[in-house]
């Protein structure tokens, strides 16, 4: 359940090389364009990587088409997207680095307890970037900003797994 919140982590930008204001703006504006598509985002991740779906007890072993339109699926998708939205909103401002670090560290700790691997975080990242690149204006500048944000996030999360 929180696995995708963890995956949401994929959107920070705080530590090793903080996002510039321009990079943060690119991440924030592209996220704003899709963040209302919670169910579609989670469905895209599950479709691309069924092993991630199987980390969620309420969705494990079920056909994606049969769960996609359920309240439970929508609720969980909203939790994940809300987490990502919070982290993204905090990015680009050095005074928020501690808050981002706390949120993302907790995400790593929570997902370690669930047996989520660094490889699965990588899968989530791949699926999220694929979704974004197909649903927002995606150029080299946007791709670079997202990659930097996700690299920063993973620098916090992966060592905690």
UniProtKB/Swiss-Prot annotation:
InterPro entries: Erythrocruorin (IPR002336), Globin (IPR000971), Globin-like_sf (IPR009050), Globin/Proto (IPR012292), Mb-like_M (IPR044399). It holds the Pfam family Globin. Keywords: Heme, Iron, Metal-binding, Oxygen transport, Signal, Transport. Heme b binds at residues 76, 111. Residues 1-16 form the signal peptide. Residues 18-161 form the Globin domain. GO terms for molecular function: heme binding; metal ion binding; oxygen binding; oxygen carrier activity. The keyword RNA-binding does not apply. Gene3D superfamilies: Globins. Homodimer. There are at least 12 different components in Midge globin. Belongs to the globin family. This is Globin CTT-VIIB-8.
